């Protein structure tokens, strides 16, 4: 593998560990736990793994353990730091007994089911330390939900002598880890299952999980790009830049990037929903900022838009729900078939309620057509294909044109469009993510050594220096509730949305009027790996505000 100068230098970085993990540990058990919701239902579904205590690791006595093998899976979308979770797990497992082996399942959970794997040796591991990406073993989106998958999994786990399986993933992947842990415990198969919290979207966090790994690096990567655009914007002074940011279920990325770069406008999906804003309300909000800046002679600006915004607008959310219903054949659960596009559009317009039809017809013709026609195999509208940034800029342009005729607007409006998503998913991890991920993996090895299953590896107090971080584990059942998914009630980990009464949003809300009027841009620049700690080791603004005492 040919390497860049940065890769070569970065490989020498030794991630920092919490003090408790720097030697032998003992597991200190807290009180019994309950799920965040639907306690009786979750307890009935997970009788073997429900109610377990929170674990905290402290310095302990050294003990000899017999050799054992561990399996690891990367599940779902990539996030910076995945390789460091594996390197921390590798080093942790080897420190317990040099004869221990680590096996990686190829291309995600599908590798477990299809018996595709590789042994991760020290030579292989050293090629991937402190690098971005999931390419050491690849990732996949196969869901581990069915008994036949679990049974195929146990076949290969037994063949390889694997005692524990570590699943690195987001809320859905860790939900599957919880189900798998319960199944293997119920069957007394003797295989432990441990989860590690991953997602750049930042929606896998709660009182126990301060942040999911990769969020720090991804937001710093996007913020560098946004800062570059803001500087260009303030240099040419003739464009409004509409920037869509990854994050379909929650607006954590948009909020964090706004805190880092201070754009003129940042939309927060959760606020749009809470205020029951219409699409026209959103457009008017942006257009007002454009008009106010134009009145000061500033015909330029930046707008940050969360990827999932359109699904949070109540009227459109209601429309999409009905479209999903009418475009699905109730007999088969599959997408309805039509002779052609026009027949399909006519069917939709005749089938949906009048209020939803009015919303559909208020949209630009091509967007309305897209909502009617683009479906997945189950008949669901493919909302992610809608270019929200272009939709909003076109509607803003139309509103400004109308205001100009009425004498309410005197400026010029020209838009540029950007979507930042994949640019941040495989970036080389920041020092924070390199340390945090390595600690998560090393910590997982200690949960395994202490015989735990159905736990998520957790590192807390991460705004402090790494030596002061707190290592331990949390029962995954503690994060579960029952939600409606694909027409059925299912146990799932509750997604963490932006809290409108939380410190990060409140700080943003206190500043946004000033940022809308003034050109108060901040230019974070690229991620730094060497230099002063205030440049290299800072956590996200979100975490700093949440943890401020």
PLM-predicted stretches and their roles:
Residues 1-23, 316-320, 333-549:
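C-terminal non-catalytic interaction/assembly regions of soluble proteins
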Residues 1-18, 63-113:
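N-terminal phosphate-binding or glycine-rich loops at protein starts, especially the Walker A/P-loop
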Residues 2-50:
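Helix-enriched interaction subdomains in cytosolic or periplasmic regions
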Residues 30-63, 112-163, 200, 211-216, ...:
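Glycine-rich oxoanion-binding loops at beta->alpha junctions
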Residues 65-73, 128-140, 198-210, 235-238, ...:
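Gly-rich Lys/Arg/Thr-decorated short loops/hinges at beta-loop-alpha junctions or inter-strand turns
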Residues 79-89, 112-113, 145-150, 171-179, ...:
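Short glycine/serine/threonine-rich phosphate/pyrophosphate-binding segments
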Residues 100, 164-169, 175-192, 207-412:
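Accessory alpha-helical/coil subdomains and C-terminal extensions
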